[in-house]
Amino acid sequence: MIEIIGILILGYLLGSIPFALLVGKWGHGIDIRQHGSGNLGTTNTFRVLGKKAGIIVLIGDLGKGAVASLVPILLASELHPLFAGLAAVVGHIYPVFARFKGGKAVATSGGMLLVTSPILFLVLLISFLTTLRLSRMVSLSSIVSASIGIVAAITIGIVEQDWIVPTFFTILALFVIFKHRENISRIRQGTESKIGMFAKDKKDTD
């Protein structure tokens, strides 16, 4: 029991590492919480600091979920890797190192799935990148991939007859969509920011 609690705490602390805040302060001298949406996540980093900083934060946030999920495997723990990954997701959303105000945990959730369900991760990655390429909106890409992921997760659960990952992913995906409710409103109004992810420069980055 002590080992399980320790792994969960470690996962939470890993998730609490605010890469967006660190990259903003160390690399650009700004507090990203005071710019854009104010979220400590990949989307706001791309929007405010550009794609180089955004990619760094994306890798960091993705890595948090992946590393946290790997810990139970490396320690041969009885704890399912999914729960360690979920602890990192909670840490990202409510980070102890950033006054409990973080991001929406899309990338961190992706890192968790990379370890716990690689097939589902691949489905999400393809849907995310395809939507991003077409819309240049990270928020819309997150919403679309979460929605497609729910269908994929249920399908995987039916095929494999293992509902642990599909069940918790579905709950997490619905939460991610809920966290994007303000983005959904802006998308409908045509005012949602776009990024220059696939552009050669930052001139079209909001």
UniProtKB/Swiss-Prot annotation:
Pathway: Lipid metabolism; phospholipid metabolism
Record field: catalytic activity: an acyl phosphate + sn-glycerol 3-phosphate = a 1-acyl-sn-glycero-3-phosphate + phosphate
GO biological process per UniProt: phospholipid biosynthetic process
UniProt-listed Enzyme Commission number(s): 2.3.1.275
Chief localisation class: membrane
GO MF term list: acyl-phosphate glycerol-3-phosphate acyltransferase activity
Keywords: Cell membrane, Lipid biosynthesis, Lipid metabolism, Membrane, Phospholipid biosynthesis, Phospholipid metabolism, Transferase, Transmembrane, Transmembrane helix
InterPro entries: G3P_acylTferase_PlsY (IPR003811)
Subunit annotation: Probably interacts with PlsX.
Family from the record: Belongs to the PlsY family.
Purpose: Catalyzes the transfer of an acyl group from acyl-phosphate (acyl-PO(4)) to glycerol-3-phosphate (G3P) to form lysophosphatidic acid (LPA). This enzyme utilizes acyl-phosphate as fatty acyl donor, but not acyl-CoA or acyl-ACP.
UniProt protein name: Glycerol-3-phosphate acyltransferase
Phylogenetic placement of the source organism: Bacteria, Bacillati, Bacillota, Bacilli, Bacillales
